[in-house]
Design a protein with these regions (language model features):
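Extracellular/luminal regions of secreted and cell-surface proteins that mediate adhesion/ECM remodeling
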Residues: 165-214
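Short coil/loop residues immediately preceding or within conserved phosphate-binding loops
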Residues: 28, 55, 103, 167, ...
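Surface-exposed intrinsically disordered loops and tails
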Residues: 4-6, 128-132
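A structural micro-motif recognizing beta-strand termini
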Residues: 32-37, 93-99
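A short acidic/small-residue loop/turn micro-motif
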Residues: 123-124
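A recurrent domain-boundary module in secreted/ectodomain proteins
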Residues: 130-169
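Serine endopeptidase catalytic core focused on the charge-relay Asp
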Residues: 1-88
Length: 214
């Protein structure tokens, strides 16, 4: 639906981010939010797949020029193609929905609900559902792994040899029972909730934390 019949919600917001990496090789940018969304927002952090395996079907979730959320579906396999300066996944035609000018940068999910790319460009619009090109996550991985591979989002941590491909959907849901400030206290008793949506059984994990003295 290109003509939105309602506005998106504005009661849940966060603002500010730092640019960690960017490259035209796959038209990728990695941003770190300046603040963590509150737990009562029920934010879902998507998993990702850096294997480079061709997807059998795809979904794009986007907010064209800040419009209310749109979802586009392709029921067929995406192909590999070069678009401009980027190595991309090519969507020949959307089966349900389309992208629009202003959808660039939106994520592409594979059949396992994992991010495999981000929208670079193409001819798709409200009047045309063909030819979209998404920069490939696996091509971006050498640029991203120093940030994603060692911070716990993959749980296996840093892999300097690049010998492992990751397909994990574990995410931090919430950290509770941590007071905003401590005075004359020697211990705290936080509660950390981890959700595993992946196919790998988690038997252990390491959590790194720090406190700011002020």
């Amino acid at each position: 639906v290109c003509e939105a019949n309602q506005n998106g919600p504005t009661n849940q917001t966060v603002s500010g981010a730092s640019l960690l990496e960017n490259s035209g090789g796959s038209d990728v940018a990695l941003l770190q939010l300046n603040s963590t969304p509150p737990s009562d927002y029920n934010v879902y952090y998507a998993g990702w797949d850096n294997s480079g395996a061709a997807p059998t079907s795809e979904v794009c979730i986007h907010h064209p020029s800040g419009d209310i959320k749109k979802i586009s579906f392709n029921n067929d396999a995406a192909g590999e193609a070069d678009w401009g300066s980027a190595a991309t996944w090519h969507i020949p035609a959307w089966d349900d929905g389309t992208t629009e000018p202003g959808s660039s940068g939106s994520g592409l999910w594979n059949q396992d609900h994992r991010i495999i790319g981000q929208l670079f460009g193409g001819q798709a619009s409200c009047s045309n559902n063909v030819n979209d090109y998404f920069g490939r996550f696996d091509v971006s991985w050498p640029l991203l792994e120093s940030h994603l591979g060692s911070c716990g989002t993959t749980l296996d941590g840093w892999d300097p040899a690049g010998s492992t491909t990751y397909q994990y959907d574990a995410l931090l849901q919430s950290i509770n029972n941590v007071p905003p400030s401590l005075c004359n206290e020697n211990t705290i008793d936080p509660t950390i909730t981890i959700k595993n949506n992946g196919t790998e059984t988690l038997t252990s994990l390491s959590i790194a934390w720090s406190a700011t003295v002020g």
